[in-house]
């Protein structure tokens, strides 16, 4: 069928539906708000599916249900309807002889797929043993002027699914399941941290100085203050101010914004968990993370084995822990990379160029080691792995390692070759932090758009004393991708960023 023919068919069907709505208006309010349901489809199935037909009949269970008409099969003086609510689907049996006179012909006969109705009736089992509501009262609650996307195959066009998520949720059970899982991930995280004595807080989304991560920010202007402001790229510096102030365990579940590329793993607006714990180090946080992910897996999937595409991730086993240098040497040996290459700037430049990496002038040895890791090792970290000991150059907020000050007490969590989280023992030496901010300013002046801004007030806060602290950020969208087995970040964000048509 051509696009033009489809448009004509759509216009014709909408015209018929509008005529039906006009007739309803003539009778009164076509959008009543007096119906109150007392049952959801999922609960009815859970409570009564196992009952035999005679036993169910003897109980005379009366229910009120409401939802959207997804299918209908007219059979003379009766119609079978599939009703969908937020929990699932239930079958309705609407027969002329069970309704007041004239209702079946005048009302039920005017219903269309997509209409929202409320019904009252008793439960029974059909000859095929399907739980069904025998309707004795019916009411149209909302007339749908547009038809459902595809009566037989659901909504399959990917772009339409993202642009018109409401249609996707109506038509695709898998999409509804995905966002239920996402909600459970967030609820599970919140429950975990509250149970550990953490306090949930909110920090500014609009910031004078964007900090806490290396990323390009969105810029806006505050008219009343006549000052440029930034959508936050991370809440880190504000959360650590709270630890200075005496809130020793804090967490925030909220949005971050980064004015960067869009991909199957990146959206400019995304949700993060960040939490900070005083009198803890990065080893404690790795332990927390393992415990949290195991709990989420059990609560959401009922198992610590998490399927993802053709892979399976085992959250039940201890997560591997490996340093960045060791990961490069382990997976880069076949490319001829040796230990000495990672401790000498010129040798690291040579390795990077051999790997086809375009070396930036602003990079020092630490940045070179990082890009070499990304090229040769990152995609090998399939099972849950904590990557540790990142160079200080790329970790401006992390505490230096006592044994090797060139690296930091930092970790990143990788699952399926993708970074899921980032944490470290916090730098609480105000003078060291000030020097690292200055180095970031120099990098920005040298052309690094993602280098951090200097936050003088944060340095002042550190001068008042930050207790030994560790903090971590976990990407909620990427966690949701894992637990929902979703291939793209757009599949787990209700309304992802899209280019305008």
Curated annotation (Swiss-Prot):
Keywords recorded for this protein, A-Z: Aminoacyl-tRNA synthetase, ATP-binding, Cytoplasm, Ligase, Magnesium, Metal-binding, Nucleotide-binding, Protein biosynthesis
Catalytic reactions on record: tRNA(Lys) + L-lysine + ATP = L-lysyl-tRNA(Lys) + AMP + diphosphate
Its EC number(s): 6.1.1.6
Cofactor: Mg(2+)
Subcellular location: Cytoplasm
Main location: cytoplasm
CDD domains, A to Z: LysRS_core, LysRS_N
Comment on bound cofactor: Binds 3 Mg(2+) ions per subunit.
Recorded superkingdom: Bacteria
Binding-site residues, Mg(2+) 2: 419
Pfam families listed in its UniProt record: tRNA-synt_2 (PF00152), tRNA_anti-codon (PF01336)
Example GO molecular function: ATP binding
Residues reported to bind Mg(2+) 1: 412, 419
Gene Ontology CC terms, in alphabetical order: cytosol
One of the protein's GO biological processes: lysyl-tRNA aminoacylation
Subunit relationships: Homodimer.
HAMAP family: Lys_tRNA_synth_class2
Family listed: Belongs to the class-II aminoacyl-tRNA synthetase family.
Protein name in the entry: Lysine--tRNA ligase
């Amino acid at each position: 069928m051509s696009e033009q023919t489809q448009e004509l068919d759509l216009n014709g069907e909408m015209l018929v539906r509008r005529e039906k709505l006009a007739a309803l208006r003539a009778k009164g309010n076509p959008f009543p708000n007096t119906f109150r349901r007392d049952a959801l489809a999922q609960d009815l199935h859970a409570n009564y599916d196992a009952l035999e037909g005679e036993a169910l009949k003897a109980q005379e269970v009366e229910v009120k249900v409401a939802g959207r008409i997804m299918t209908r099969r007219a059979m003379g003086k009766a119609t079978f309807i599939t009703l969908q609510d937020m929990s699932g689907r239930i079958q309705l049996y609407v027969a002329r002889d069970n309704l007041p006179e004239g209702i079946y012909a005048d009302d039920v006969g005017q219903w269309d797929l997509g209409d929202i109705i409320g019904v009252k009736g008793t439960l029974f089992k059909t000859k095929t043993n399907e739980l069904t509501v025998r309707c004795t009262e019916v009411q149209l609650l909302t007339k749908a002027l547009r038809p459902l996307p595809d009566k037989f195959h659901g909504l399959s066009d990917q772009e339409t699914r993202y642009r018109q998520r409401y249609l996707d949720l109506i038509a695709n059970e898998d999409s509804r399941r995905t966002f239920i899982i996402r909600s459970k991930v967030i609820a599970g995280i919140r429950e975990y941290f509250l149970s550990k004595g953490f306090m949930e807080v909110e920090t500014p989304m609009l910031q004078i100085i964007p900090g806490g991560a290396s990323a390009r920010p969105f810029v806006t202007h505050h008219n009343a203050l006549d000052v440029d402001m930034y959508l936050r790229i991370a809440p880190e510096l504000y959360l650590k101010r709270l630890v200075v102030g005496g809130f020793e365990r804090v967490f925030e579940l909220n949005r971050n914004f980064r004015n960067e590329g869009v991909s199957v793993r990146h959206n400019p607006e995304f949700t993060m968990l960040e939490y900070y714990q005083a009198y803890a180090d990065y080893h404690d946080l790795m332990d927390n993370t393992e415990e949290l992910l195991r709990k989420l897996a059990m609560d959401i999937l009922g198992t610590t084995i998490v399927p993802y595409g053709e892979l399976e991730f085992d959250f039940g086993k201890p997560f591997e822990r490996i340093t960045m240098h060791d990961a490069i040497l382990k997976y880069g040996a076949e490319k001829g990379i040796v230990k000495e290459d990672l401790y000498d700037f010129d040798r690291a430049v040579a390795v990077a160029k051999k790997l086809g990496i375009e070396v930036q002038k602003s990079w020092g040895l630490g940045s070179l080691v990082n890009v070499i890791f990304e090229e040769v090792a990152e995609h090998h970290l399939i099972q849950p792995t904590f990557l540790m000991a990142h160079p200080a150059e790329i970790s401006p907020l992390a505490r230096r390692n006592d044994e090797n000050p060139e690296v930091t007490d930092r970790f990143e969590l990788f699952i399926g070759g993708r970074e899921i989280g980032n944490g470290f023992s916090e730098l609480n030496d105000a003078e060291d932090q000030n020097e690292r901010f200055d180095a970031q300013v120099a990098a920005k002046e040298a052309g690094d758009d993602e280098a951090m801004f200097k936050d003088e007030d944060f340095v002042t806060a550190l001068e008042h004393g930050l207790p030994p602290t560790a903090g971590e950020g976990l990407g909620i969208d990427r966690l949701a991708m894992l637990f929902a087995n979703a291939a793209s970040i757009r599949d787990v964000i209700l309304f992802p960023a899209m280019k305008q048509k």
